[in-house]
Amino acid sequence: THGQAMFFRLEWFAMKYSNDDELLALCRNELFSAVIGDVMDLMGYTHQFLPPQVQPLRDDMIVAGRAMPVLEADDDGGEGPGRVNEMLNQPFGLMLRALDDLQKNEVYVCTGSSPSYALWGELMSTCAINRGAVGAVVDGYSRDTKGILEQNFPCFSYGRYAQDQRPRGKVVDLRCTIKIGAVKIQPGDIIFGDLDGVCVIPKQIEKEVIEAAWEKAHGEKRV
């Protein structure tokens, strides 16, 4: 029967991954943003796509990883011992700490600044790759485009703009809850992005979403 077939397909799906590496690889290789978004819509999660201007730097880039949220702020030029965190007196604030804190399979996700300078670049990509991170998604621009493309590092941004964040902005917090557009992003949520955009899968529903998206994707291929 159809019910039995569905059961066996989902049982087979559950055997396709036994750890986070395999789960995220399955997302990258077998899913796409539209089907993930459709599934979350049906579950009542109707605001999970980042604004449409956040696009891959190259059309074939796909990102699937765990969110490491980073909060940026425009730099007012203020310095001194009155600051709660002396790291904020550094030229990039907590940016170097954020890069150093990246873990395997994580995605650097940044918001909070005005769209007047680049939030990601080649050297940041190099640091991220060395730490096992799998992508960057920024609510703003990226730069050093040639270098990022040569590294084949998935980068999603508003597009290319060379103006540097120093002395215009600083990272002020990391591993915190952030919001991009209407989407709340918490540490550990799954970030999935492809040519059609970037969506956020809340950690608490990731298993149900990915299983349903896999079933829907494979069902559509059979039609």
Model region roles, listed by residue range:
Residues 37, 47-48, 66-69, 106-109, ...:
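Structural motif
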Residues 137-139, 145-193:
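A contiguous pocket-lining binding segment that forms or flanks enzyme active sites
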Residues 40, 128, 189-191:
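Buried hydrophobic positions in well-ordered alpha/beta secondary-structure cores of metabolic enzymes
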Residues 190-223:
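A hydrophobic, small-residue-rich beta->alpha segment in the mid-to-C-terminal subdomain
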Residues 97-139:
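Extracellular/luminal Protease-associated
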Residues 12-98, 219-221:
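Intrinsically disordered, low-complexity regions enriched in acidic/Ser/Thr/Pro/Gln residues
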Residues 1-14:
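Short, Lys/Arg-enriched N-terminal segments with co-localized hydrophobic residues
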